[in-house]
Amino acid sequence: MFVDQVQVEVQAGKGGDGMVAFRREKFVPFGGPAGGDGGHGGSIILYVDEGLRTLMDFRYQRHFKASAGGNGQGKQMYGRAAEDRRIAVPAGTTVTDADTGEVLGDLTEPGQTLVVAKGGRGGRGNMHFVSPKNTAPEISENGEPGEHRFIKLELKVLADVGLVGFPSVGKSTLLSVVTQAKPKIAAYQFTTLVPNLGMVQLDDGTDFVMADLPGLIEGASQGVGLGIQFLRHVERTRVLLHLVEMDPDNGREPLDDYDQIRKELGAYDDNILKRPELVVATKMDLPGAAERFADFKAALLARGVAADHIFEISSLTHRGVTPLMHKTAEVLKTAPHFEPKQAAVKTADYKYQPEPALKVTRDSDGTFVLTGDKIERAFKMANLDHEDGAMRFARQLRSMGVDDALRDAGAESGDLVAIDDFTFEFVE
């Protein structure tokens, strides 16, 4: 099993601003406030798409933003609610808050959804702020900011196809040709120290996951080299592509190589030998390779290996690669699935401790700076374009304990106070 992980940024839409407006119609002398509410901002919603197998699409787009709600209008007209931004993920995706480590959810069933960033509510228009003392309020709210966060998507991927063979037979090269994976490639044993994973996408829309499994050597089933670790990966694949190199100068016989790998696979688990297998002769661009392949193919046919399961390719010239991939996709259609044994997972309890609602600090120039989720939200929703709105915001600050907090921090009348990009003077 391989873990595919990616971090993405999500920004939900801001709510639409409420409107300050008054009813002005002929024969209606005291129409009163008629400012409508803003529309709700769009949320970011993940949903399970059973057609997806990997998180590959997130390699190309890692920032997602939903639309803002429409602003309120006069005549008590509400702003348009924004559409939610829906993002497809494969089944088995675990979603975690990148900053806190909190698991937001596990998406396992087709159609299952998870809201990862909630859209802001629309600000209220002035029709909501009528009181006996203020029958014509010039007060409205800006839309609430949408949630913004970084999330980690983690998917445990089972490879559909496993590339097996001796070291340096061309597994990593083939993977790099048929996928966008960039494995480390060199001509020495155990170049691949961890399995490389790639998605093969054919021109007919078919796709499957391919794993380049590190080269096996004699004794792998007894743990020689990195054998046992990699044989565990092999047992989870549905189809094997068994690569055998035809290089006349490698000092080995192709049929002996083929038999040795089959022996190690069988020694580890007989059931692996029952998996569908395509035999792939590699490095066919080398001089003398054609003659070696003719003898190798004849020996395989004599053993009962189907002719349409034997391929010759050159990853250098791409010869034979496309037919091999199409045959692999065809075999996969009828290949059974193999569920991995679930290992116990050790988990640690984690509880996120939110920041204090209000924090007062002082800049080098003497300005007192107010921070905290609650106060910043109140500021962003305050419409300070009208005196009534500014007075309402001042009352909100006082009710949150801002005045007392500033005094405790040493603020005196006339000192400057900043919230975000807004600066005002503290008055006792």
Swiss-Prot record:
Its cofactor is Mg(2+). It is found in: Cytoplasm. The keyword Nucleotide-binding applies. GO terms for cellular component: cytoplasm. Its EC number is 3.6.5.-. Residues 1-158 form the Obg domain. Residues 159-333 form the OBG-type G domain. GTP binds at residues 165-172, 190-194, 212-215, 282-285, 314-316. Residues 350-428 form the OCT domain. SUPFAM superfamilies: Obg GTP-binding protein C-terminal domain (SSF102741), Obg GTP-binding protein N-terminal domain (SSF82051), P-loop containing nucleoside triphosphate hydrolases (SSF52540). One of its GO terms (molecular function) is GTP binding. Mg(2+) binds at residues 172, 192. One of its GO terms (biological process) is ribosome biogenesis. The keyword Hydrolase applies. Keywords: Cytoplasm, GTP-binding, Hydrolase, Magnesium, Metal-binding, Nucleotide-binding. An essential GTPase which binds GTP, GDP and possibly (p)ppGpp with moderate affinity, with high nucleotide exchange rates and a fairly low GTP hydrolysis rate. Plays a role in control of the cell cycle, stress response, ribosome biogenesis and in those bacteria that undergo differentiation, in morphogenesis control. Belongs to the TRAFAC class OBG-HflX-like GTPase superfamily. OBG GTPase family. Monomer. HAMAP family: GTPase_Obg. NCBIfam families: Obg_CgtA, Obg_CgtA_exten, PRK12296.1, PRK12297.1, PRK12299.1. This is GTPase Obg. The gene is obg.
